[in-house]
Amino acid sequence: MKLVVQRVTEASVTVEGAVAGRIGPGIMALVGITHEDTEEDAAYLADKIVNLRIFDDESGKMNLSLLDTGGEILSVSQFTLYGETKKGRRPNFMNAAKPDQAVLLYEKWNELLREKGVKVETGIFGAMMDVQLTNSGPITLIMDSKQ
């Protein structure tokens, strides 16, 4: 399971002209799932992301987590995170999980975040989406449950 994590002051996702999810300060997470991922991968990254100290304390030092700040998460499924570009000019997405497998794990991931007390907004799985965000910092991290 792979994430692109961005600290944001605000973020939203729109599908067919309608806002599907919107957050204030928190984390925008693009979520990629491969065919080898399990609920253990989702649990590991859910725990990691809510406790990741990427928010500033009163001294301006990144010392606070999402749980510490009461921030929100905008979670957007993103199979293209598993795109392979070594050969040719068109990405190969064979490493991405099939949609029927990925949607279950994506929903589990969001459920695990909510169980930790975090407000989670989402896009619509499998839809074409427009994502807008204001990256704070900028702080952008790539997280992988296998690395």
From Swiss-Prot:
<dbReference type="InterPro" id="IPR023509">
    <property type="entry name" value="DTD-like_sf"/>
</dbReference>
<comment type="function">
    <text>An aminoacyl-tRNA editing enzyme that deacylates mischarged D-aminoacyl-tRNAs. Also deacylates mischarged glycyl-tRNA(Ala), protecting cells against glycine mischarging by AlaRS. Acts via tRNA-based rather than protein-based catalysis; rejects L-amino acids rather than detecting D-amino acids in the active site. By recycling D-aminoacyl-tRNA to D-amino acids and free tRNA molecules, this enzyme counteracts the toxicity associated with the formation of D-aminoacyl-tRNA entities in vivo and helps enforce protein L-homochirality.</text>
</comment>
<dbReference type="GO" id="GO:0005737">
    <property type="term" value="C:cytoplasm"/>
</dbReference>
<dbReference type="Pfam" id="PF02580">
    <property type="entry name" value="Tyr_Deacylase"/>
</dbReference>
<keyword id="KW-0694">RNA-binding</keyword>
<dbReference type="InterPro" id="IPR003732">
    <property type="entry name" value="Daa-tRNA_deacyls_DTD"/>
</dbReference>
<keyword id="KW-0963">Cytoplasm</keyword>
<dbReference type="GO" id="GO:0051500">
    <property type="term" value="F:D-tyrosyl-tRNA(Tyr) deacylase activity"/>
</dbReference>
<keyword id="KW-0378">Hydrolase</keyword>
<protein>
    <recommendedName>
        <fullName>D-aminoacyl-tRNA deacylase</fullName>
        <ecNumber>3.1.1.96</ecNumber>
    </recommendedName>
</protein>
<dbReference type="GO" id="GO:0106026">
    <property type="term" value="F:Gly-tRNA(Ala) deacylase activity"/>
</dbReference>
<dbReference type="GO" id="GO:0000049">
    <property type="term" value="F:tRNA binding"/>
</dbReference>
<dbReference type="GO" id="GO:0019478">
    <property type="term" value="P:D-amino acid catabolic process"/>
</dbReference>
<feature type="short sequence motif" description="Gly-cisPro motif, important for rejection of L-amino acids">
    <location>
        <begin position="137"/>
        <end position="138"/>
    </location>
</feature>
<dbReference type="GO" id="GO:0043908">
    <property type="term" value="F:Ser(Gly)-tRNA(Ala) hydrolase activity"/>
</dbReference>
<comment type="subunit">
    <text>Homodimer.</text>
</comment>
<comment type="similarity">
    <text>Belongs to the DTD family.</text>
</comment>
<keyword id="KW-0820">tRNA-binding</keyword>
